[in-house]
């Protein structure tokens, strides 16, 4: 077969691509850092995170009570508050400063403050206030304290309305306290828990962040092992852009195809989280998401000079990326600039799409905007990766030629010196 024929070039390109794939796959399993980020972290971290929030809600949250009113109504408020399964009136303090010291020592997670004029204002027909102070370091404890206090206050308000309503029958009192009856039926997050709300987004974000860390660390290793500190080695197998890009991308796509199915199907089932995922829908959704993450990571790998650099580039972005998706903060309240900035990352559309698939049972047709955006990102980042690797290949060849010329000049100088001797 002639070397100039098209068939020979295709076969040679496939052979080189397989060689690059084999080399990269071997490096993934031999490099401890890459192995940790690409295999161990995606396997272990979701289990730890899911186990932490497996209970969905917290019970018996310790609370400090500051009752300066010492009235019948204030005692009723405290008694009803303590009767809730979510909170516990652990300490009774004489001042707000004393309660603050308990919060500082982490003995309690919140304070209920009832002022001295609480009952007096109620008897005058004025609006009374109850202060609720919560430790915001853990959202679950904040939710338990605040919602319980709000529920008790609503119940006492209903009793005040009934006493002042002047009704003659129980039905009159019922209408006075609850003029509009409604049934609260959670449609998607049936437990109302933190795990079902946040975990789907975290799982998808883990997929992207660990991939970026693994690809970046592998790129840093390649530069450190290269004599010229280049990303691409000068070799006959690394002679074309597409064979390099496809060879490297195949490695991470194969690894994270398995990890993606594990994170989206296995982990939610293990811990009993709400999951309405069908394997056909998730397969179609993960295909563009993983590809876009792979090409995004390969494109960014040119910025990594040393193995440690990738930690600075990737790790600190995890929490901001989660916020910018709109999963833990309303998307309508995110400034337009940050919403546009979030479109750069595949995790933005990946989290939004997977949350609808997992919690709402959406099909690919229902998440068409996110699905299209992921395919657009795949195409854009693939072209960007090809351009980046083209520049890296040129730089590697240029430095290799300069090194060879310098070596030849040194050899000629040595020969001249020997001839003179």
Language-model-derived ranges and their functions:
Residues 1-196, 366, 391, 397-421:
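Extracytoplasmic/periplasmic domains immediately adjacent to an N-terminal transmembrane anchor
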Residues 14, 18-22, 196, 237-250, ...:
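Alpha-helical membrane-protein architecture signal
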Residues 28-35, 206, 247-253, 257, ...:
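Loop-to-transmembrane-helix entry motif
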Residues 37-38, 200, 246-247, 310-313, ...:
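Hydrophobic core positions of alpha-helical segments in small-molecule transporters
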Residues 38-39, 196-197, 316-317, 342:
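Hydrophobic alpha-helical transmembrane segments of integral membrane proteins
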Residues 44-47, 185-268:
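Hydrophobic alpha-helical transmembrane segments of multi-pass membrane transport proteins
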Residues 48-49, 70, 91, 101, ...:
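Membrane-spanning alpha-helical segments of multipass transporters and channels
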Residues 73-77, 148, 215, 295, ...:
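Hydrophobic alpha-helical segments typical of transmembrane helices
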